[in-house]
Amino acid sequence: QKLSTLLEVEDLVVDIPVPSGILHPVREISFHVDYGETLCIVGESGCGKSLTSLAIMGLLPNAASRNAKQLNLEGESLLEIPESALADLRGDKLSMIFQDPMTSLNPSYSIGNQLGEVLMRHRGATRAAARDRAVYLLEKVGISSAASRLGQYPHQLSGGLRQRVMIAMALMCEPRLLIADEPTTALDVTIQAQILLLIRSVQKEFNIGVILITHDLGVVARVADRVAVMYSGQIVETGTAIEVFEKPLHPYTQGLIDCIPIPGKTKPGEQLGSIPGIVPTLVGDLSGCTFRDRCDFAQNECADDVGENVLGAGRQFRCILPAELGSRKELVAVQ
């Protein structure tokens, strides 16, 4: 583990018993996050992105089980510490911005109470000190007249303001790792851009490692340092944002990128790209590449277990075919 590594995840597995068997929503995924770095985990709904974040936070549903070879924050295993110690970490070194700002804040408590509680709980701060910190951070996240907002309740704020409050709350104790689970989903496009810029600026200022979970490749292009592409509970490709966008190595990543309209290039009314087929079930025994039934490059060998190909530091993809997409097309042509 490098000195610059903040979070190290190796072979993380999440299993959930369901009436038809065992659901495997997260299957042996590995990644790391460095200090001051943004890792975007991208994939469609149901691929296991949010459960990955909940597994790191220790907030999985009671029925779910979590296992991993390594799950370390600043060298300390999150698998071996008791729940009370994990509760001390959450909101302190480890913070999360949840998906829907409309329902993430408690409607019964004022903004000031909810912000202050974090610092008082983890730092033993006085109410006055917590109030000062809350005002400072509300101003930092772009909320005007911050002191007057402390007495307001969530229903008195717009969605964009509520999400800014959630970001301020996550920053109250100067966390080392911030997990943002689709933080712009419920917001309009203009506010989305503001929130992304805000997360980026506070990350650089406080040297926070960020895991940004999203299904929006536009968000990824805007803020990611590195990208992990998830499909059916597995990470199928990792690399820097530039590497993944300019030279995708997994057919699923290529399919996602082909779905994006390009201003000035995509003609009005032109049919957009799509990925045929449906996502397979993750219940029961799974083998081979789960994307094979939807893949243009599928081979008989895809039904066998597919390992990770490592091209260099931080550049991997899970496919039996060569990295050069042109070579794949030649293979398909001769079939």
Spans of features found by a protein language model:
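A short, proline-enriched helix->beta-strand linker immediately N-terminal to the Walker B motif
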Residues: M172-R176
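Charged, flexible cofactor/metal-binding loops and thiol motifs
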Residues: T240-Q335
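Conserved ABC ATPase "signature" region
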Residues: E76-S77, A129-S148, I257-D258
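Conserved ABC transporter NBD signature motif
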Residues: S65-S77
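ABC-type ATPase nucleotide-binding domains, specifically the catalytic core motifs of the NBD
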Residues: I16-S20, G58-A63, E80-I81, L86, ...
